[in-house]
Curated annotation (Swiss-Prot):
<keyword id="KW-0472">Membrane</keyword>
<feature type="transmembrane region" description="Helical">
    <location>
        <begin position="173"/>
        <end position="193"/>
    </location>
</feature>
<dbReference type="GO" id="GO:0016192">
    <property type="term" value="P:vesicle-mediated transport"/>
</dbReference>
<comment type="similarity">
    <text>Belongs to the YIP1 family.</text>
</comment>
<dbReference type="GO" id="GO:0030134">
    <property type="term" value="C:COPII-coated ER to Golgi transport vesicle"/>
</dbReference>
<dbReference type="GO" id="GO:0005802">
    <property type="term" value="C:trans-Golgi network"/>
</dbReference>
<feature type="transmembrane region" description="Helical">
    <location>
        <begin position="111"/>
        <end position="131"/>
    </location>
</feature>
<keyword id="KW-0812">Transmembrane</keyword>
<feature type="topological domain" description="Lumenal">
    <location>
        <begin position="194"/>
        <end position="196"/>
    </location>
</feature>
<feature type="transmembrane region" description="Helical">
    <location>
        <begin position="133"/>
        <end position="153"/>
    </location>
</feature>
<dbReference type="InterPro" id="IPR006977">
    <property type="entry name" value="Yip1_dom"/>
</dbReference>
<dbReference type="InterPro" id="IPR045231">
    <property type="entry name" value="Yip1/4-like"/>
</dbReference>
<feature type="topological domain" description="Cytoplasmic">
    <location>
        <begin position="218"/>
        <end position="227"/>
    </location>
</feature>
<dbReference type="GO" id="GO:0005789">
    <property type="term" value="C:endoplasmic reticulum membrane"/>
</dbReference>
<dbReference type="GO" id="GO:0006888">
    <property type="term" value="P:endoplasmic reticulum to Golgi vesicle-mediated transport"/>
</dbReference>
<feature type="topological domain" description="Cytoplasmic">
    <location>
        <begin position="154"/>
        <end position="172"/>
    </location>
</feature>
<dbReference type="GO" id="GO:0015031">
    <property type="term" value="P:protein transport"/>
</dbReference>
Length: 248
């Protein structure tokens, strides 16, 4: 190691001063890479943190998995497949769950299932030669807002009951109970419904959706002997979609 000596500038002629060998720095004593690497390794071992790389591969890239210690993406955004399956079963077999609906299912505001059902309804109409995606989502949005406000007016004066009734709860219930009308639109692909048989079948599917949705809302609002009163506006709401399948 050399440095410029300013004190003996006149004697040495302004040159560089080379220290003796006894003051030389030993080789490798200032190797920062080894020191930092060893300290980091010691800290990692002390903290118990192990290397945690992401899995590689095209399948992992398209999946919703992240690091092993992190929750899945679907869980973080609130999509629960168990609730989706349970709600779908309740709509398909309403008599089986006639004793009561769990409060956890009623308070679930999942909209993944309703969006899928409305998309299937539009696709089935498209396969039947009817393009009504704008009408479907427009009527669904306007009807959900109207039925939510009406349900709040019909709910009890209990504060806890009113706080449980949120807009997305109403939208989730109406969307899941829309599933029978998807079967109606699927039937319209293979057979025309603008006849007496089609009218009867459409009425049955509308009643199916109305009965299940009124049961959900009646349990959520904790009303007594008011299911038929709730069912009347729901019947009108689902009848609009049945008319799309038959006439439009």
């Amino acid at each position: 190691m050399s440095f410029y000596n300013t004190s003996n500038n006149a004697n040495n002629g302004g040159g560089f001063y080379q220290p003796s060998a006894q003051f030389a720095v030993p080789q490798g004593s200032m190797s920062f890479q080894n020191t930092v690497g060893s300290s980091n390794t010691g800290n990692d071992n002390n903290l118990g943190v192990a290397p945690d790389p992401l899995p590689v591969g095209i399948l992992h890239a398209l999946s919703t998995k992240g690091y092993p210690h992190e929750p899945p993406l679907l869980e973080e955004i609130g999509i629960n497949f168990d609730h989706i399956i349970t709600k779908t079963k309740m709509v398909l077999i309403p008599i089986r769950f006639g004793s009561g609906v769990p409060q956890e299912i009623l308070n679930d505001s999942d909209l993944a299932g309703p969006l899928i059902f409305f998309l299937l309804f539009g696709l089935f109409l498209l396969m039947a030669g009817k393009v009504h995606f704008g009408y479907i989502y427009g009527v669904a949005l306007f009807g959900t807002i109207s039925l939510h406000n009406l349900s709040k007016l019909m709910s009890n004066n209990d504060t806890s009951t009113q706080t449980n009734l949120q807009f997305f709860n109403t939208a989730s219930i109406l969307g899941y109970c829309f599933l029978p009308l998807c079967f109606l639109s699927l039937l319209g692909i293979f057979h025309g419904l603008n006849n007496t048989t089609g009218y009867v079948v459409s009425v049955l599917f509308v009643i199916w959706s109305t009965w299940t949705s009124s049961g959900f809302l009646n349990s959520l609002l904790q009303l007594q002997n008011a299911r038929l009163l709730i069912a009347y506006p729901l019947l009108i709401f689902y009848s609009v979609f049945a008319l799309m399948v038959i006439f439009v």
